[in-house]
Amino acid sequence: MSYPTKEGSDTAGNAHKNSENEPPNDCSTDIESPSADPNMIYQVETNPINREPGTATSQEDVVPQAAENSELETEIQKDQREEDLKEELLLLQTPIPRKLVSHKPLNDRSRSHSGKVEMKANNFPINHKTRFRLSTSWRVPFINSHEIRSMILHLLCDRYFSQAAGCQNTMWVKRKYIACLYHPNSFTHHERAITFRRPSRVHYYRPLTERMTSGKFCKSTDTKGKCRFRAIVRSVLFVSQIQIESIFNIKGFVDILTYIHTMNVMITNTNNGWKYFCPICGRLFNTYSELRQHSCSSSGN
C-alpha cells in the first residue's frame, strides 16, 4: 500500500515542480515579449519620423527655389520693359529749344548761327553746337519800306481779317484772307493774294440762327472781278511815305496803332502806295479819311 503512495507523492511532487516551473516561464515570456516589441515599434516609428522630415525639407527646398526663379523672371521682365521704355523715350524725345544763347552780333545772326546753343528737353539739358538757318521772323523787320508794308499787312490780316464777305453766311467755308502786298517782282497795278492762318476773331453781320437757316450757299456781291474780296478789317492803318521814312519814331507809330475803328474796307497796294477800296461802290481812295467821308460809309450801309 506504501508503493502507490510514493508514486502519488512523486506525481504530486512532479506536478508541483511543473507548476512552479511553468509560471516563471510564462512570466518570462510575457516580460520578454514587451521588451522586444517596444524596440521594434520604436524602430518602426523612428523610421517614418526620420523619413517625414526628409520629405518636408525637400519640399521646403523646392518652394524657395521656385520663388527665387519667379522673382528672377519678374526682375528680368521689368528690366526688359524699362529698357524698351527708355529706347522708346529716346526715339520719341525731341529737344525743344527754350533758351538760345548767342555769341555773335545781330548782323551775323541774320544770316546763320553757329555759336553755342543751350537746349532743354524735359529735365536734362543738351549743350552742343548747331548751324541752322534763321527764319524771317528772326530778322530785323525795319529794313526797307517793302518789308515794313508787308509786315504791317501781315499783322492786320493775321489778327483782324474776317472771312470773305461773299461767304459770310456759311459756317463750313474754308476761310481765306487776302493781303495786297507790293513786291518789285510783281506786275504793276496788280494785287497779290496771300493766304494766312485763321484769325483770332470772326465778325458776322447776322445772328447765328439766321446764318443756320439761310442755307449753305450764298451769292457773291463782287462786281469788279474775281480778284477782289470784301473783308472786315479792324484797326485800319494808313502809313504815309513820311511816316515810313521816320518809322523809328516810336511815339508817333504807337499813336497810329492805337486808333481803332471797325469798317468794311479793302486795303490794296500798288506802285503808288496803299489804296483803300470801298466794297459797296468800288471806288479807290488814297487816305482813310476820304474813305470815311464818302456816302457809302454811313451807318445805314
Swiss-Prot record:
Transmembrane segments: none annotated. Residues 1-77 are annotated as: Disordered. Expressed in a variety of fetal tissues. InterPro entries: Znf_C2H2_type. Residues 44-60 have a biased composition (Polar residues). It comes from the Eukaryota. This is CPX chromosomal region candidate gene 1 protein. The gene is CPXCR1.
